[in-house]
A protein has these predicted regions:
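Residue-level detector of alpha-helix initiation sites
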Residues: 51, 201-202
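Conserved active-site-proximal phosphate/metal-binding subdomains
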Residues: 2-13, 178-196, 202-362
């Protein structure tokens, strides 16, 4: 285990018997998730555009987790190529994340089915019933995101096979509710399908707490974005290592007439310029220089290509350095296998300590 993630001192180090007992408990807690995914650990890699491609996805799967390709704006032929390239690097299960608003969603679903992808994640809105039907008839499992209990119940009725509940602590596009609250709202009431938690997860002991509430596993994105196997630029990774939790902030909206989709990223010069840009656009709108529609487009277009500039080009000042609040727990660039090993060990030690407290009280 890496030095920066050590969780015990020699004086309280668990015995082999304690560790064995705790691992059995952990295996039981996330068995539903591991059986659903076909993996050793119920740890999913969050799909991140420009980051979650063949190298990172295969590394997560090879380490016992479940890697997920981020399709993003890929065309069908490009996605087919990425799936094939990932298969060349791992013989273990992995999934594909598709954006429901993609104009070629049906074709992308078929690409996944033709390639034998066993799990398809539908993100970015309520998935079309036709897509869910096609995926299930094609023999694959459907995973969907739910930001509220009412939607979770609706998705289950629509036939999804598993849910991800993602809190506002996550990086990228986020909702307004924390994972702590979502878990309390949803986990007690959705038991017919596996539910995976996401948003702010950086340590295994935190994951254990959600498993004990009824979650089937966890999804982590920020923790893997700066892994050795990630193709992200070194400047992007260094920004993660330097950052504290408070540095991952959501985008600012100046005027409710011009909505801004909330995105959590590291604060930088680009973010500050975005605020100034909004103020200028609003001034021009109020002066009659822009229509409301034109003003909205000018605001939305500010970040065009910004994620690629940060991830691929390493422009961490003008680009969008999407990161969740768990970025403060990214203290070095590590191999994926080490990250997962640390998470599992932290979870195991947390269960050992829990058992010790119970024994002491008993």
């Amino acid at each position: 285990m890496s030095e920066q993630n050590q969780v015990v001192t020699p004086s309280d180090a668990p015995t082999d018997a304690e560790l064995q007992r705790a691992r059995k408990r952990l295996d039981a807690l996330w068995r539903r998730g591991t059986e659903f995914l076909g993996t050793q650990y119920a740890i999913l890699g969050g799909a991140m555009s420009w980051v979650s491609e063949r190298n990172l996805v295969s590394a997560i799967s090879n380490a016992g987790g479940f890697g997920v390709i981020a399709c993003g704006a890929m065309e069908p032929a490009r996605l087919a190529e990425e799936i094939q390239a990932t298969r060349a690097l791992t013989d273990r299960p992995f999934g594909v994340n598709l954006i429901t608003m993609h104009p070629q969603l049906n074709e992308l679903v078929q690409v996944c089915l033709d390639a034998g992808v066993g799990h398809i994640v539908l993100a970015g809105g309520i998935p079309p019933g036709a897509a869910i039907k096609a995926i299930k008839e094609g023999g694959a499992k459907v995973i969907a995101f739910s930001p509220a209990l009412v939607l979770a119940k609706r998705l289950v009725k629509m036939g999804v096979d598993a849910l991800v509940i993602e809190g506002a602590e996550a990086g990228g596009h986020v909702g307004p509710v924390s994972l702590t609250v979502l878990a309390q709202e949803i986990l007690p009431h959705i038991q017919s399908v596996p539910v995976f938690v996401a948003g702010g997860l950086g340590r295994g002991d935190a994951l254990v707490s959600y498993l004990e509430q009824g979650a089937s596993g966890g999804q982590l994105g920020t923790r893997f974005a700066a892994a050795e196997e990630s193709i992200a630029h070194e400047k992007f990774k260094k920004a993660f290592v330097r950052a504290a939790a408070r540095d991952a902030v959501t985008s600012v909206q100046l005027d409710e007439r011009f909505p801004v989709i909330p995105v959590r990223a590291l604060g930088n010069e680009g973010g500050r310029q975005f605020v100034s840009h909004q103020a200028d656009v609003i001034r021009r709108f109020q002066a009659g220089e822009l229509t409301r529609e034109a003003a909205q487009l000018e605001i939305e277009h500010f970040w065009a290509g910004a994620l690629r500039r940060a991830v691929i080009d390493g422009d961490v000042e003008q680009g969008s350095v999407m990161a969740g609040q768990s970025v403060g727990m990214v203290t070095s660039v590590q191999p994926v296998a080490q990250i997962i090993e640390d998470l599992v060990e932290q979870a195991t030690v947390a269960l050992v300590r829990q058992q010790r407290r119970m024994d002491a009280d008993g």
